[in-house]
Amino acid sequence: MTNLRKSHPLVKIINHSFIDLPAPSNISAWWNFGSLLGICLIIQILTGLFLAMHYTSDTLTAFSSVAHICRDVNFGWLIRNIHANGASMFFMCLFLHVGRGLYYGSYLFKETWNIGVILLLTVMATAFVGYVLPWGQMSFWGATVITNLLSAIPYIGTTLVEWIWGGFSVDKATLTRFFAFHFILPFIILALVIVHLLFLHETGSNNPTGINPDSDKIPFHPYYTIKDILGLILMILLLLTLALFSPDVLGDPDNFTPANPLNTPPHIKPEWYFLFAYAILRSIPNKLGGVLALLASILVLLAIPLLHTSNQRSLMFRPISQTLFWLLTANLLILTWIGGQPVEQPFIIIGQMASISYFTIIIILMPLAGMLENYMLQPKYP
């Protein structure tokens, strides 16, 4: 009799994905973030489900219902704090996961990479509509400002914005539909994650060297299950530290004030994980140009496999490209800082310089560095 996990139609799929999966023997802790993202998604869906049981998507009661969850529901404060800070953990893991893909050339698995970029966009959309739900000042004005950007689309822009709003301003209809979107999108993300893994398991994982690892594979279980559990413990520790000791440190104080359409907050800014894109949006003094730059800042990831010029896959043995990669990382941190600053000098010019460098490094300098490194590695005979 064959082992059940190898013969049962359902268990067999799990076995080939998480137990007997051949994995490269040398993948580092940077490969932990995929499983951490899976755990983050499960945490967000479960805490979100319990929050949705008590939340009301009506402009008059939304803010009060969130207060009610925190005050009157058993462990409601904990569920809410884990959900709010879980989003931050999700994005921390996402950015590190994408960074790993860029550094080690994982983007050459084109289908996996493209599904990953679609996943990133979907998670960003989910976080945006979710941020509107507590109906605080920053929720309301964030929704107003960001949805208003669509009015920059020629001819159909204004109609499109009013269609999304369900009226002539962000109001009850907007809140209700955003709640509906926020509920359905995580399940769409779940489906996309399965497709992401499906394509990944067609090729197998990349590894730090970027060399074909087929000659040296080990089973996923027990080696990488144990390794993933270590990463999981550390992430849960960080998440609980955030949620229990300083749950509001990453939020905006303005969101403790109920939404008021007649009073604009002094500085409208999104959550920290959108600040880099917000800085790029603001660095262009033209509405349509800003929107296009905002889109390009994420969609440029789709072009990265086409911009790969090096004969080597990974950056592990490419010091010039490595330097550019860390410059890009520093640049993104500068953009994140600028996104949270008021629109005045010197922040305007710093933001514009950082936005230009962001696109220059990715589109021009990285491909050139790859070509230069190829040339430098060519044997030179006397």
UniProtKB/Swiss-Prot annotation:
Coiled coil: none annotated. Its main location: mitochondrion. Gene3D superfamilies: Cytochrome Bc1 Complex, Chain C (1.20.810.10). The lineage of its organism: Eukaryota, Metazoa, Chordata, Craniata, Vertebrata. GO terms for biological process: mitochondrial electron transport, ubiquinol to cytochrome c. Pfam families: Cytochrom_B_C, Cytochrome_B. Heme 1 (or BL or b562) is low-potential and absorbs at about 562 nm, and heme 2 (or BH or b566) is high-potential and absorbs at about 566 nm. The gene is MT-CYB. Heme b b566 binds at residues 97, 196. The chain crosses the membrane at residues 33-53, 77-98, 113-133, 178-198, 226-246, 288-308, 320-340, 347-367. This is Cytochrome b. Belongs to the cytochrome b family. It comes from Thylamys elegans. Heme b b562 binds at residues 83, 182. One of its GO terms (cellular component) is mitochondrial inner membrane. Its cofactor is heme b.
